[in-house]
A protein has these predicted regions:
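Residues forming the flavin
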Residues: 1-203
Length: 203
């Protein structure tokens, strides 16, 4: 049995108008980018046009971010959200990717008092924390009202943040306006993987 992978990143929220040309014909666009600096794979996942950012809890009470959308048009919002995840494959001697992912999520919980963090992309790029006043100035209105304004650079490793920023800059060519100061980033989003059975030609 083996499993040495974990995907860690953020949930991105932007106005529908930025993603409509992708989500209307495709609903969920699957975008992949290999980051310039660290060459990590960065992918989009779970795209929700007109959706809501949500909070869910893992074992041990760890709060992480997720998202969903409703089939009922009357329940849809003016925003689209999706995960942007950095794929991480660890090598020996480390072999506890689930523990690592939980640890990163717990850092976010520590800084928010147990909830999900939100930051404007513009504040992240300027190296400053998003606070209540800066969030109030955002033209993108957060759909997760309980999210706590903060600074994701205190939570996500430099490798992950750099890869996410580089991918967002690249994806902006496909969806102009994505790489905007008012784009909202929620953290942490973590995807774990089950152990795989190692087989050979005899089994």
């Amino acid at each position: 049995m083996s499993n040495n992978e974990v995907d860690i990143g953020v949930r991105v929220e932007v106005p529908n108008s930025i993603m409509d040309h992708l989500t209307k014909p495709l609903y969920e666009a699957k975008l992949v980018y290999y980051a310039d600096t660290f060459e990590n794979k960065v992918r989009t996942f779970c795209m929700n046009p007109g959706g809501l950012v949500s909070e869910e809890h893992y074992e041990g009470g760890i709060a992480v971010v997720n998202g969903h959308s409703y089939n009922d048009a009357s329940l849809r919002t003016e925003n689209t959200n999706f995960a942007m995840l950095v794929s991480t494959h660890f090598t020996k001697p480390f072999g506890e990717p689930i523990r690592y992912g939980n640890y990163i999520a717990q850092l976010g919980n520590m800084l928010t008092g147990g909830g999900v963090m939100v930051q404007r992309l513009g504040d992240l790029l300027l190296g400053r924390r998003t606070d209540e006043s800066r969030l109030a100035k955002s033209t993108t209105r957060p759909t997760l009202k309980t999210a706590v304004p903060g600074d994701l650079s205190f939570v996500l490793p430099h490798r992950h943040l750099t890869s996410i920023i580089e991918a967002m800059r690249a994806f902006d060519k496909l969806a102009p306006g994505l790489y905007s100061r008012n784009t909202l980033l929620y953290g942490v989003e973590v995807k774990f993987y089950s152990s795989k059975v190692n087989v050979n030609n005899r089994f």
